[in-house]
Protein backbone atom coordinates (compact mmCIF):
# COMPACT_ATOMS: atom_id res chain seq x y z
CA UNK A 1 0.00 0.00 0.00
CA UNK A 2 2.79 2.47 0.84
CA UNK A 3 4.50 1.94 -2.51
CA UNK A 4 1.28 2.08 -4.54
CA UNK A 5 0.02 5.28 -2.90
CA UNK A 6 3.12 7.11 -4.14
CA UNK A 7 2.76 5.99 -7.78
CA UNK A 8 0.51 6.85 -10.71
CA UNK A 9 -0.41 3.18 -11.24
CA UNK A 10 -3.94 1.76 -11.35
CA UNK A 11 -5.10 -1.01 -9.03
CA UNK A 12 -8.27 -3.04 -9.56
CA UNK A 13 -9.69 -4.77 -6.47
CA UNK A 14 -12.49 -7.16 -7.41
CA UNK A 15 -14.65 -9.29 -5.14
CA UNK A 16 -18.12 -10.72 -4.75
CA UNK A 17 -20.39 -10.56 -1.75
CA UNK A 18 -21.62 -13.61 0.15
CA UNK A 19 -19.94 -16.53 1.94
CA UNK A 20 -16.24 -16.84 1.18
CA UNK A 21 -16.11 -13.31 -0.20
CA UNK A 22 -12.83 -11.43 -0.28
CA UNK A 23 -14.69 -8.22 0.60
CA UNK A 24 -13.00 -7.83 4.02
CA UNK A 25 -9.59 -8.11 2.33
CA UNK A 26 -10.62 -5.55 -0.31
CA UNK A 27 -11.80 -3.15 2.40
CA UNK A 28 -8.63 -3.63 4.47
CA UNK A 29 -6.32 -3.08 1.49
CA UNK A 30 -8.26 0.01 0.37
CA UNK A 31 -8.12 1.43 3.90
CA UNK A 32 -4.37 0.78 4.04
CA UNK A 33 -3.88 2.63 0.73
CA UNK A 34 -5.92 5.54 2.07
CA UNK A 35 -3.84 5.68 5.26
CA UNK A 36 -0.64 5.66 3.20
CA UNK A 37 -1.94 8.45 0.96
CA UNK A 38 -2.87 10.56 4.00
CA UNK A 39 0.63 10.07 5.41
CA UNK A 40 2.21 11.03 2.07
CA UNK A 41 0.04 14.16 1.87
CA UNK A 42 1.17 15.15 5.36
CA UNK A 43 4.80 15.20 4.19
CA UNK A 44 4.14 17.79 1.45
CA UNK A 45 4.31 21.56 1.91
CA UNK A 46 0.66 22.15 1.05
CA UNK A 47 -0.66 19.00 2.68
CA UNK A 48 -1.88 17.66 -0.69
CA UNK A 49 -0.71 14.81 -2.86
CA UNK A 50 1.18 16.13 -5.92
CA UNK A 51 -0.81 13.67 -8.04
CA UNK A 52 -4.40 13.10 -6.81
CA UNK A 53 -5.38 9.62 -5.66
CA UNK A 54 -8.73 8.66 -7.19
CA UNK A 55 -10.76 5.84 -5.66
CA UNK A 56 -13.92 4.58 -7.34
CA UNK A 57 -15.69 2.43 -4.75
CA UNK A 58 -18.33 0.64 -6.79
CA UNK A 59 -20.68 -1.52 -4.68
CA UNK A 60 -18.95 0.03 -1.67
CA UNK A 61 -21.54 -1.24 0.83
CA UNK A 62 -21.02 -4.83 -0.32
CA UNK A 63 -17.31 -5.20 -1.05
CA UNK A 64 -15.55 -2.15 0.42
CA UNK A 65 -17.24 -1.36 3.71
CA UNK A 66 -14.63 0.81 5.46
CA UNK A 67 -16.07 1.66 8.88
CA UNK A 68 -14.13 4.90 9.29
CA UNK A 69 -15.11 6.28 5.87
CA UNK A 70 -17.94 8.61 7.05
CA UNK A 71 -15.75 10.28 9.68
CA UNK A 72 -12.92 10.96 7.21
CA UNK A 73 -14.94 11.69 4.08
CA UNK A 74 -15.02 15.45 4.55
CA UNK A 75 -11.28 16.09 4.64
CA UNK A 76 -9.94 13.61 2.08
CA UNK A 77 -10.57 16.09 -0.75
CA UNK A 78 -8.30 18.67 0.84
CA UNK A 79 -5.46 16.16 0.71
CA UNK A 80 -5.88 15.42 -2.99
CA UNK A 81 -7.76 12.17 -2.35
CA UNK A 82 -10.86 11.96 -4.56
CA UNK A 83 -13.41 9.31 -3.59
CA UNK A 84 -16.46 8.23 -5.58
CA UNK A 85 -18.79 5.99 -3.58
CA UNK A 86 -21.41 4.08 -5.59
CA UNK A 87 -24.48 2.71 -3.78
CA UNK A 88 -27.60 0.98 -5.06
CA UNK A 89 -29.77 3.01 -2.70
CA UNK A 90 -29.68 5.28 0.32
CA UNK A 91 -31.02 2.40 2.44
CA UNK A 92 -28.00 0.31 1.45
CA UNK A 93 -25.76 3.06 2.83
CA UNK A 94 -27.76 3.14 6.07
CA UNK A 95 -27.33 -0.62 6.43
CA UNK A 96 -23.58 -0.33 5.93
CA UNK A 97 -22.72 2.80 7.94
CA UNK A 98 -25.85 3.68 9.90
CA UNK A 99 -28.14 6.68 9.42
CA UNK A 100 -25.65 9.13 10.94
CA UNK A 101 -22.76 7.73 8.90
CA UNK A 102 -24.44 7.88 5.51
CA UNK A 103 -25.73 11.39 6.25
CA UNK A 104 -22.15 12.49 6.94
CA UNK A 105 -21.04 11.09 3.59
CA UNK A 106 -24.01 12.59 1.74
CA UNK A 107 -23.41 16.03 3.24
CA UNK A 108 -19.63 15.95 2.72
CA UNK A 109 -19.77 14.92 -0.95
CA UNK A 110 -19.12 17.87 -3.29
CA UNK A 111 -20.98 16.13 -6.11
CA UNK A 112 -23.98 13.84 -5.68
CA UNK A 113 -25.63 11.98 -8.56
CA UNK A 114 -29.08 10.37 -8.45
CA UNK A 115 -29.69 7.87 -11.25
CA UNK A 116 -33.25 6.84 -10.42
CA UNK A 117 -34.68 3.42 -9.65
CA UNK A 118 -35.24 4.20 -5.95
CA UNK A 119 -38.58 4.01 -4.11
CA UNK A 120 -37.54 5.17 -0.62
CA UNK A 121 -40.02 7.93 0.15
CA UNK A 122 -38.01 9.62 2.91
CA UNK A 123 -34.86 9.89 0.80
CA UNK A 124 -36.77 11.00 -2.29
CA UNK A 125 -38.57 13.68 -0.30
CA UNK A 126 -35.20 15.04 0.83
CA UNK A 127 -33.98 15.05 -2.77
CA UNK A 128 -37.18 16.78 -3.90
CA UNK A 129 -36.64 19.49 -1.27
CA UNK A 130 -33.05 20.02 -2.48
CA UNK A 131 -34.31 20.56 -6.04
CA UNK A 132 -36.70 23.18 -4.73
CA UNK A 133 -40.00 24.74 -5.73
CA UNK A 134 -41.31 26.91 -8.52
CA UNK A 135 -44.27 29.25 -8.75
CA UNK A 136 -47.34 28.14 -10.68
CA UNK A 137 -49.74 30.80 -11.93
CA UNK A 138 -53.42 30.32 -11.12
CA UNK A 139 -56.26 32.19 -12.80
CA UNK A 140 -59.79 32.09 -11.42
CA UNK A 141 -63.01 33.62 -12.72
CA UNK A 142 -66.29 34.14 -10.91
CA UNK A 143 -69.71 35.12 -12.18
CA UNK A 144 -72.08 37.15 -10.04
CA UNK A 145 -75.86 37.34 -10.21
CA UNK A 146 -75.57 40.69 -11.90
CA UNK A 147 -74.00 39.01 -14.92
CA UNK A 148 -70.64 40.48 -14.08
CA UNK A 149 -67.44 38.52 -14.30
CA UNK A 150 -64.46 38.97 -12.04
CA UNK A 151 -61.03 37.59 -12.67
CA UNK A 152 -58.16 37.09 -10.25
CA UNK A 153 -54.59 35.98 -10.88
CA UNK A 154 -52.42 34.43 -8.20
CA UNK A 155 -49.68 31.89 -7.79
CA UNK A 156 -48.78 28.96 -5.60
CA UNK A 157 -45.58 27.10 -4.79
CA UNK A 158 -45.11 23.63 -6.25
CA UNK A 159 -42.25 21.14 -6.16
CA UNK A 160 -40.23 21.06 -9.38
CA UNK A 161 -39.94 17.28 -9.09
CA UNK A 162 -42.02 15.49 -6.47
CA UNK A 163 -41.43 12.05 -4.97
CA UNK A 164 -43.37 10.29 -7.73
CA UNK A 165 -41.38 12.10 -10.43
CA UNK A 166 -38.08 11.08 -8.84
CA UNK A 167 -39.15 7.46 -8.40
CA UNK A 168 -40.08 7.35 -12.10
CA UNK A 169 -36.95 9.10 -13.40
CA UNK A 170 -36.48 7.68 -16.91
CA UNK A 171 -33.55 5.48 -17.84
CA UNK A 172 -30.83 7.61 -19.37
CA UNK A 173 -31.47 10.59 -17.11
CA UNK A 174 -29.74 11.62 -13.88
CA UNK A 175 -29.79 14.48 -11.40
CA UNK A 176 -26.51 16.11 -10.43
CA UNK A 177 -26.09 18.09 -7.22
CA UNK A 178 -22.80 20.00 -7.11
CA UNK A 179 -21.58 22.50 -4.54
CA UNK A 180 -22.52 26.08 -5.36
CA UNK A 181 -24.88 25.18 -8.23
CA UNK A 182 -28.54 24.45 -8.72
CA UNK A 183 -29.44 20.79 -9.32
CA UNK A 184 -29.06 19.79 -12.97
CA UNK A 185 -30.97 17.19 -14.99
CA UNK A 186 -28.58 15.47 -17.40
CA UNK A 187 -28.60 12.75 -20.04
CA UNK A 188 -26.24 9.88 -19.33
CA UNK A 189 -24.02 8.31 -21.98
CA UNK A 190 -23.76 4.49 -21.87
CA UNK A 191 -20.23 3.23 -22.43
CA UNK A 192 -21.30 1.36 -25.59
CA UNK A 193 -22.25 4.70 -27.13
CA UNK A 194 -19.03 6.44 -26.09
CA UNK A 195 -15.69 6.90 -27.86
CA UNK A 196 -14.02 3.97 -26.07
CA UNK A 197 -16.71 1.38 -26.82
CA UNK A 198 -14.55 -0.75 -29.13
CA UNK A 199 -11.65 -0.89 -26.66
CA UNK A 200 -14.00 -1.83 -23.80
CA UNK A 201 -15.64 -4.57 -25.87
CA UNK A 202 -12.26 -6.01 -26.81
CA UNK A 203 -11.14 -6.01 -23.18
CA UNK A 204 -14.35 -7.66 -21.99
CA UNK A 205 -14.10 -10.31 -24.70
CA UNK A 206 -10.50 -11.07 -23.73
CA UNK A 207 -10.80 -10.97 -19.95
CA UNK A 208 -14.45 -11.68 -19.27
CA UNK A 209 -15.54 -14.77 -21.23
CA UNK A 210 -19.22 -15.47 -20.97
CA UNK A 211 -20.20 -11.83 -20.40
CA UNK A 212 -23.18 -10.71 -22.45
CA UNK A 213 -22.11 -7.54 -24.23
CA UNK A 214 -24.76 -4.84 -24.84
CA UNK A 215 -25.80 -4.35 -28.44
CA UNK A 216 -25.60 -0.76 -29.74
CA UNK A 217 -28.99 0.73 -30.55
Language-model-detected regions and their locations in the chain:
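P-loop NTPase motor domains
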Residues: 1-81, 164-185, 190, 194-195, ...
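Conserved ATP-driven motor cores of ASCE-family P-loop NTPases powering translocation/secretion/packaging/pilus
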Residues: 73-178
